[in-house]
């Protein structure tokens, strides 16, 4: 137990979202899909989703009802979402293989719909609707779906559709009657985060994909502490993720329980060039206030003599680690929150590598 609630200092590690700097870059069709079965199933990460469907074909039917040819093809589509704008992009590609038999003059047709949005909410570049198809050719369009007219602190869940089929300009061929559909309904756009100048900026993610915060040798002592804390039973793995707490007052209460700034506990822990590191993070629902009587430490080198080395699923861990590393790790966490658009109550997991314990006090 700590000796009462105390104030939190301004030099606590910063963990507010940071969205300054360039947006992340990626490709529409990446190994995320290229290395998976091409079976028409979507694969998603936090800011990227894609799908490939091969071995498709449509039969060409003439006006007498006879099957006279075949159009084999593969569909590839990918969506990229940004963490600092409300415009997400989708590439839709159809690769045509060797056309067989009599195929007439087939055309590539498509229709775009963007649910519950005003006119002008998307733009399209690439193949024209109704353009002629040739064997060995690809038809590619890139759609910019725009979600930028959002009030501050708003959330939206856009649904976008690309419907497509094959027409035919040959009067002796019946145009295709069935339409394929590429539907994206798992994007979330929000305007809850701000640039350093205080301006709110929209961003979009695939909200069903849980982001992963990677701790490395860039902050070895903090990485080590988190590794040991999770190994002792605390949450943070993919199967038991943390959940972001955006309320500053609740984050401060977490810190007050785990890392008091004043009093006998703080005085006994204090070491030159070290600062108090708590896990689970103060910026998570699972922070110290969730189980204030279940504090622990993970090693004698942590210099937290008021807590014992123990294990268990609930509680929190405290370790005195290098102060500069602690501050830098807080900045990295804020950058992670911003780039992955981890908003209030979003789940996230951790991966650690390259940790090293603090020295003997």
Task: Give each language-model segment a name.
Residues 1-273, 282-361:
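Nuclease and nuclease-like effector domains acting on nucleic acids or nucleotide cofactors
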Residues 276:
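Short hydrophobic beta-strand that contains or immediately precedes a catalytic carboxylate
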């Amino acid at each position: 137990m700590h000796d009462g609630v105390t104030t939190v200092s301004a030099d606590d590690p910063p963990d507010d979202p940071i969205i300054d700097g360039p947006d992340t870059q990626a490709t529409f069709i990446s190994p995320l899909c290229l290395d998976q079965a091409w079976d028409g199933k979507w694969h998603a990460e936090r800011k990227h989703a894609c799908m490939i469907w091969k071995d498709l074909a449509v039969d060409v039917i003439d006006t007498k009802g006879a099957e006279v040819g075949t159009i084999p093809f593969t569909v590839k589509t990918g969506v990229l979402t940004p963490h600092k704008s409300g415009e997400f992009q989708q590439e839709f590609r159809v690769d045509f293989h060797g056309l067989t038999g009599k195929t007439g003059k087939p055309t590539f047709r498509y229709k775009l719909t963007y649910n519950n949005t005003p006119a002008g909410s998307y733009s399209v570049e690439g193949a024209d609707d109704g353009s002629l198809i040739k064997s060995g050719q690809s038809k590619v369009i890139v759609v910019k779906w725009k979600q930028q007219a959002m009030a501050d602190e708003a959330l939206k869940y856009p649904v976008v559709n690309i419907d497509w089929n094959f027409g035919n300009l040959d009067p002796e061929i019946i145009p295709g009657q069935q339409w394929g559909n590429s539907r994206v309904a798992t994007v979330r756009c929000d305007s809850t985060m701000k640039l350093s100048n205080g301006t709110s900026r929209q961003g979009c993610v695939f909200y069903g994909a849980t982001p992963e915060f990677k701790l490395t040798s860039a902050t070895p002592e903090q990485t080590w502490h988190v590794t040991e804390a999770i190994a002792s039973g605390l949450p943070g793995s993919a199967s038991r993720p943390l959940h972001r707490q955006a309320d500053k007052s609740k984050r401060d209460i977490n810190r007050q329980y785990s890392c008091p700034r004043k009093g006998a506990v703080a005085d006994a822990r204090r070491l030159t060039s070290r600062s108090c590191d708590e896990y689970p993070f103060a910026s998570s629902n699972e922070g110290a206030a969730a189980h204030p009587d279940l504090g622990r430490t993970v090693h004698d080198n942590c210099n937290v003599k008021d807590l014992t080395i123990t294990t268990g699923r609930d509680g929190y861990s405290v370790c005195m680690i290098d102060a500069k590393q602690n501050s830098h790790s807080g900045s990295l966490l804020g950058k992670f929150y911003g780039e992955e658009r981890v908003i209030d109550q979003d789940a996230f997991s951790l991966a650690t590598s390259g940790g090293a314990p603090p020295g003997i006090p």
